């Protein structure tokens, strides 16, 4: 205990604790920065060997008592304060070291211990493994079916033929018996069969375990035209698909250059397809020198002036009604004013 320049006594114990950042008697106060986190309270309490009282200016009684204490008592008190401060500092240092070692051991144990694998990762790996195995199995099965004769062609079924022969279809398809079904390109087979003149369309299908089915649609003659090599049959698209005697009651077509891209041919076919069935059976010839000048000749010699293909459905309906009336020439080129002569 000493005096300042103003004569006020100074508590050396309080001054020393202010320097080291620890409150007197190692008790600490809220907000003191000197106490290390994790300090063992038991160690600090054990380090206190004697209670120390802090002297302030607000305690005159204590001030008077300390002012008149003897030198021996003051020396003993100061030694006790130093011993208490030393013990508290040792306790704080030991607590700090213990906390540091505990944190180090915890970090080491966490680093050395293997981390458990998440359940989601395990499920994902299992799903991936199963997918890969199924893919490999499916690929192996497909490869086996592609090369093995276990599922090969043993029978070829052909449907839809009337005038086209089975041999023509098989020759065009080019499929050999014993060929694995998976090696057959069905689109290519259908295209090859459709190349036959009398075939309008074709379809090839695999029928497991050992059959190939080919379905065709033959062309149907709609009109016929005479050529030097004989009569040629044309279907509804204007395709010349056969040179053969025409079926009975098939009308002849008179155009310059019949074909699927000829405008006059297409116009004449539009008219024939618009006629009622009972009228079509009476048509012997259809002439189309141009798309706007179409004429029908009936089997009994009567003539029908049709005109262009405009309003073909209306003209066909009016013509069916007019043919019930006597006459030699029927004009439906203007369906609003049909006439009979």
Swiss-Prot record:
A GO term from the CC aspect: plasma membrane
InterPro entries linked to this entry: Cell_div_FtsQ/DivIB_C, FtsQ, FtsQ_DivIB, POTRA, POTRA_FtsQ_type
One Pfam short name: FtsQ_DivIB_C
Keyword Transmembrane: yes
Stretches assigned to the Extracellular side: 148-341
Keywords for the protein's UniProt record, in alphabetical order: Cell cycle, Cell division, Cell membrane, Membrane, Transmembrane, Transmembrane helix
Reported function: Essential cell division protein.
Family: Belongs to the FtsQ/DivIB family. FtsQ subfamily.
Designated name of the protein: Cell division protein FtsQ
Originating species: Mycobacterium leprae (strain Br4923)
Gene: ftsQ
